[in-house]
């Protein structure tokens, strides 16, 4: 398999993996081995184009059992072209038209908007490369907004003051996922498709790569520095947790109990800044690692169906998480293991995804509503407030505060856009 075809096959798998739960579970179209691509397609002028170009490395399951809006289909074709699909403009337009007509969007939960005292302003920027699928955003102290261009295989940056954007192509297969900056301003990422951790020297534009010492650690996910400058990271499907010493380049990998099936995912530190806490995507657990002994302690969450995408930590060292499987927002007490849950505004199918904490308020996005909804929860009053994301959101997979504490950086993967949600002063109009 060529490098390009391998990349396309990984993309196809990831596209199917992030379909809404109802689309994954309630499969309507059954395989048919007699059909090109393994699944039947409706008749249409571009049917053969789809069969010829969308089955190079995978079958058509991701298409026939998907749930996409016209805008989603447009961006899907852009992403595939960005990754190297061999189709010209005319063919791409024909494929988009066929997919939109043949596979209309199915019903999704409607976002519930709750009024409240906080006012926000949404700003957004498109990535220079169409179909880049920015996975994670990063707001740096100098005011820049960075993103991981997963399908474009680059790291990008925009200046919110001027709108000027720049992309830094990664010279090897990377599929960048999570991003974090160090004290010198370098940008580090998890090479989700390249089994490495990468570092971009912003001053020179040069990359340095740290390959995983075990080939099973194929998909580094979320990186985060501790207070001592050690980079910790999760390896989702490989089932590892890892840490990298930037001074020596040494990487230590270890399997938490039950991995790889549990799939380590989100990663956070409490106020001590040394002991990492992480969630599993494959089970209903939160775990922590003793940084001195590497002993892992796990906490089983009350609902066996709980699945966590992202987490946030408030100043009282409470861990908050959105339960992707049931639409709830929950608080986890690391000292006792106690959990308290709140029903999210848009209900059990809303699929909370990106999450962060700003001034001890929890902000997250309901990713399965159309459009996506931005939600704010005040732990003091135990009240929600929510807004529609004007551009639609396109699944906001991660978010973080801006350096001044007055905004939230977001990535809108399905739209190939990044944005900042400005939290306005209380006296603003």
What are these regions (language model features)?
Residues 159-163, 201-205, 245-249, 290-294, ...:
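Short loop/turn segments that connect beta-strands within beta-propeller blades
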Residues 394-429:
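Blade-level signature of beta-propeller repeat domains, shared across WD40, Kelch, NHL, RCC1
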């Amino acid at each position: 398999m060529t490098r390009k075809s391998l990349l396309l096959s990984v993309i196809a798998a990831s596209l199917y993996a992030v379909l809404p739960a109802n689309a994954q579970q309630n499969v309507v179209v059954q395989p048919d081995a007699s059909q090109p691509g393994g699944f039947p397609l409706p008749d249409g002028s571009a049917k053969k184009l789809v069969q010829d170009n969308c089955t190079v490395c995978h079958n058509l399951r991701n298409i026939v059992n998907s749930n996409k809006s016209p805008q989603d289909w447009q961006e899907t074709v852009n992403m595939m072209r960005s990754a190297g699909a061999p189709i010209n403009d005319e063919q791409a337009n024909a494929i988009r038209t066929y997919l939109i007509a043949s596979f209309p969007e199915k019903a999704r939960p409607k976002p519930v908007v709750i009024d409240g005292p906080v006012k926000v302003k949404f700003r957004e920027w498109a990535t220079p490369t169409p179909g880049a699928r920015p996975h994670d955003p990063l707001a740096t102290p100098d005011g820049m907004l960075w993103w991981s261009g997963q399908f474009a295989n680059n790291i990008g940056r925009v200046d919110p003051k001027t709108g000027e954007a720049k992309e830094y192509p990664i010279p090897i297969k990377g599929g960048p996922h999570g991003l974090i900056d160090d004290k010198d301003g370098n940008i580090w990422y998890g090479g989700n498709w390249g089994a490495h951790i990468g570092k971009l020297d912003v001053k020179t534009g040069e990359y340095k790569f740290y390959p995983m010492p075990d080939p099973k650690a194929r998909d580094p996910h979320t990186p985060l520095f501790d207070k001592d400058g050690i980079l910790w990271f999760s390896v989702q499907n490989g089932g590892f947790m890892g840490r990298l010493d930037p001074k020596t380049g040494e990487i230590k990998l270890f399997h938490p109990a039950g991995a790889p099936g549990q799939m380590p995912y989100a990663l956070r530190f409490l106020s001590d800044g040394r002991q990492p806490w992480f969630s599993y995507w494959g089970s209903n657990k939160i775990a922590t690692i003793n940084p001195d002994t590497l002993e892992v302690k796990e906490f089983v969450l009350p609902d066996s169906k709980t699945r966590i995408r992202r987490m946030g930590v408030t100043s009282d060292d409470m861990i908050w998480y959105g339960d992707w499987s049931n639409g709830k927002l929950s608080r986890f007490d690391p000292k006792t293991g106690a959990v308290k849950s709140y029903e999210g505004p848009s209900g059990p199918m809303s699929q909370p995804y990106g999450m962060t904490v700003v001034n001890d308020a929890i902000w997250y996005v309901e990713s399965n509503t159309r459009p996506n909804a931005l939600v704010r929860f005040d732990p003091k009053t135990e009240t929600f407030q929510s807004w529609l994301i004007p551009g639609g959101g396109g699944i906001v997979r991660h978010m973080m505060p801006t350096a001044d504490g007055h905004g939230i950086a977001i990535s809108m993967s399905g739209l190939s856009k990044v944005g900042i949600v400005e939290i306005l002063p209380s006296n603003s109009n």
